[in-house]
């Protein structure tokens, strides 16, 4: 009889909420800083790890943006994405839908083309050599203006075939989805799939706004949906997925501790919830560690872990045929 940890390791899984910049491990950060002669405010890898003690989304974002400064060349972005794909292979992540934040890089003088070419070359190699399928989702930084978002949308159009969808991330409170309503209308016209972070630090009204104002196909986080019973019922009825990130929620104190997390409660109610790692280099765990945490702290059963893995494919942007191919392997 395999243990739950062994079951998690063997389960085919999709990851739908992963920021590629958030997979930058301290070792690679140091290596790229030396190569590119970028000064870091840390003397060692250990010092960086110690600095990863955040108490809020904002304190995390401060170090996240500082770390991203080491990414300058196409090969840097390739190395970053390739390192994540090797983790995927080790954890039996068969499909991944990756967020990237072009504004984090274009604001530093790195071209959109440099970012997208480096990442997509790694993704192409990942499909060919590792058998991992993937899609790219471009995120707009919500603490910036909508007009800046329009500039990035324009920059993305020559690379339209490399980007499946668009999302919305960064500091949530004070930057509701409605701030970007016109931008997301244009994104829909361009044929992009639509997702958005909502209901992590922002209340349930942010989730409603993402649904009605942005017309999202998926909600990233969404854990505060339980503040509104009508919203929970809507999510169940429409089967709009939530890409939940348990270890991230605890690290950023959106949830006090894992034993209080609502992911399994939502699953049992019939909400289409999935498990994801968010920014794993910063939050102390990749996808399997998030599944293991649910087993350890919430006593997730074998059937619940399998249901979450099935949901990861159901909630993906894969074709129905490919979704079923993976789901059959889990059932």
UniProtKB/Swiss-Prot annotation:
Keywords: Hydrolase, Metal-binding, Nucleotide metabolism, Zinc
Superkingdom of origin organism: Bacteria
Residues bound to Zn(2+): 17, 19, 197, 278
Signal sequence range: none
Bound cofactor: record note: Binds 1 zinc ion per subunit.
Functional note: Catalyzes the hydrolytic deamination of adenine to hypoxanthine. Plays an important role in the purine salvage pathway and in nitrogen catabolism.
Protein name: Adenine deaminase
